[in-house]
Amino acid sequence: VESVHAYSGLKSGTPVGVDTRKKWLQRHKQGYPGVPYRKLFFLQGATLAKIIYTRTDEAPLLATYSLKPVVEAFAATAGIDVETRDISLAGRILSQFSDYLTKEQRVDDALAELGKLAQTPEANIIKLPNISASVPQMKAAIAELQSQGYALPDYPDSPSTDEEKDVRARYDAVKGSAVNPVLREGNSDRRAPVAVKNFAKAHPHRMGVWSQSSKTNVATMDDHDFRHNEKSVIMPTDDVLTIKLVGADGTETVLKSDLKVLAGEVIDGTFMSAKALDQFLAAQVARAKEEGVLFSTHLKATMMKVSDPVLFGHVVRAYFADVFDQYGDQLNAAGLNGENGLAAIYAGLDSLDNGAEIKAAFDKALAEGPALAMVNSDKGITNLHVPSDVIVDASMPAMIRTSGHMWNAAGEEQDTLAVIPDSSYAGVYQTVIDDCRAHGAFDPSTMGTVPNVGLMAQKAEEYGSHDKTFKIPADGTVQVVNSAGDVLIEHAVEAGDIWRACQTKDAPIQDWVKLAVTRSRLSGMPAIFWLDPERAHDRNLTTLVEKYLKDHDTEGLDISIKSPVEATQVSIDRIREGKDTISVTGNVLRDYNTDLFPILELGTSAKMLSVVPLMAGGGLFETGAGGSAPKHVQQLVEENHLRWDSLGEFLALAESLRHFANTDGNAKAAVLADALDRATETLLNEGKSPSRKAGEIDNRGSHFYLTLNWAKELATQTEDADLAAVFAPVAEALAAAESEITATFIDVQGSPADLGGYYSPSEEKTNAVMRPSSTFNAIIDGVKK
C-alpha cells in the first residue's frame, strides 16, 4: 500500500473517503504511475471510512431529509463518508418481494446487510426510530406501495394455499420489531447527557399534579400468567432442542425444531392461561365501571408481535363480551376477532349483511360499559381501536406524568385503570403510581436520574421469543426436549393458551455484567440489577450475575440485586433526593425504564443518549428511546410544521464521530464530535429546539441553528487549523443569512404539505418540503465541495 500513500501524500492508516478512492481508481485507469490496481483494491476494502445513517419512517425520516445533508457535508471534511441504508417499513417490504417487482423497482435487503455489518469491528451505525408494524400498518403500507405501481400481493389474513403461506411468511418477517433484534449485537447503555439533564433542571417540563385521592391503579394477574408459570434451565452443553405439543390422545405436533443452543445459555418456557386471562379481564371491566374510572389496556403489540395481538383480542372481546356472545361466531368467521382492534372490526362490518345491526350492538356496549380511555377524543379513537396505538412503555409514563390521567371521550382528563395482564413488570408502574399518590408528582428541576444498562444482545429474553411463541391449538402438554430425548421444560396447557420460550446466551450476560461495572465505575453511581426472585429466569440470572461480578474489580462500588418493585422504590426515593441510580435490567425493562425515567425527568425519551457497544467492537448509536411519532407527521401534512426534536440525532452523531476517532485514529472526527457537543448545548441554552405550534421554529429551523453553532465552534477551535479554515467562511455565510433562512422556514408553515406518500414518500416532494431554503442548501452544498 506504500506506493498509494506516497502518491496521495497521506500517512499510512489515514481513513480515505469514497470520492478520493474513485479519483485514485480513475487515475490508475489513465495510466498514472504509483497507483497499482492490486494495492488500490486492497486499500478500498481495508480503509473504508464510513458511517451508516439509517433511513427509517415517519417523523425521523422527514427529519433525515433536512439533517443528513448537513451531516454528510461536515463529516466529509474529516474524510468520512456518510452512507444511507433503507430499513424503513416500505423498504423492508420491497426487499422481500424482488420476484414480484420489475428490475428497476428491486431493492437490496439493507437490514440483512447491516445485521452482518453489526458483527464486525468496522460497524458504525446511526439508527433512528422505525415503525414496528402491526397488521393494520402493514396493510396500509402495502396498499400505498401498490398505488405507487409496485405489484405486491395483498396481505393474506388466513393463508390457505402454499403461495399465500409463502407471502404471509415474507410479510411476517417484516412485521413487529423486525429491525432492532438484528442490529443489536451488543448490550445497551442509555443515559441523559449532562447538558441535557442540566437544561431540563433549568427549564423543567410540565408535570401534572397528583391527588392523594386518585383512583388510578394498575390491574395485573396474580397467577396463571407468564410470570407465574415460568420454568428455566441453564444449558450444560451445546445442544439442539425441539419444542413439541403432546396432545391428550398422545399425538405429537412439533412446534419448533432444530433450535440450536449453546453451553451456558439460559432457556425459559412459560405460558399465559387463556381461561384465567378471560376471568381476570371480565373482573377488570366490572371494576372500572364500579370505580368510575377509565378502562385502558397497555400492551406492546408491536415488539411482542405474536403474543400481544392475541392478548389485545382477549381485551376487546372482554369489554364487548355481550356483543361477542351474540355475534361471536359470525365475527370470527369474518376474521374480526379483535386482535387487529376495534377499527378493523368496524371496517369489516361493512361486508356483513347485518353489519349495521352489529355496529349498533358495539355502540350500545360502549354506552353501557366503563368509559374507555381515548387515543384521540376528537376523532372518537379509543384505547381499543388499534393495537399499536397504545404502547405500554410510552403510554404508562405519559399517564403518570399527567396526574395519573388519560383522556375520556369528552377530551377531559380522568383517573384510569391501567390493565397490564402479565404481572412480570406491572409492579414497577404500580410502585411509581403509589409513590406519586403519597408524595405528589416528581420535580424535574431537582430530581436525580436513572440511566440504564440493558441486556439485549443476540435477541435476549422476551424480545427474541417471537419465533418460539405459539397460540396452543389443543389441550395437551408442551415439552422442550433435548437431542437425547430428555424433557427439560414442560407445561400442561389448554387450547387458546399462549406459550413461549426465550433464550439468553452466556456471552451477552457476561458482557452485560461487565458494562454495568464499567458504567458504575465511570459515573460513580450505584448500580442495581433488577431481578425478580419469584421468576425462574431471574433466579438463574441472579446466579450468573453473582458469578460474573467476581471477574471484575468492584471495590468501592455499590452494586446490588433487587426485585423490580424494590429496585423501583429505592430508585425513586433517591430521585426525590436528587440522587442518581443505574438500573441494570433485562431486555423488556430496558425498554420500559428508558421511557419511564426520561419522560419523568426530561419530558421525553427522545433526548436520551443511547449507545450499543457492539460485542465485535463496532458501535450502534440509537437516536433516543422514543418512537417514530406519527402525530408529528400528521401535523406536518396539515400545516407544514414538523415538531420532531432531533436532539437524539445530534447526541448519537457526536458519539458516532467520537467512536470513529477512537477506532480509526481520525483526529478530525474527534474535533467534529467535541464541537458538535458544544453546539448542541448552545442550541438548548438558546431555546432553539422545535416548538409544537405552527408559525414558530420547527425541526428545520432547529437544524439551521445546530449547523450555525457547529460551524462557529469549528471555526473558532484551535485543535485543527485546517477545519478552522474550512468552517470560518461557512459560519460567516450562515450568520449573514440567518434572518433570510429562518424567515423561509417560518413562511412555508400554515398550509398543507404534500409528501407524495406516507410510508414511501416522494424523494422530490419531501426534499422540497424539508429543504425549502435555497440559500441554506447552497451553503451546505458548498461545504461538500
Give the positions of each predicted feature.
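A structural signal for well-ordered alpha-helices, especially hydrophobic packing surfaces
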Residues: 661, 680-684, 715, 735-738, ...
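Short, charged, amphipathic alpha-helical segments
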Residues: 724-732
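Short, Lys/Arg-enriched N-terminal segments with co-localized hydrophobic residues
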Residues: 30-48
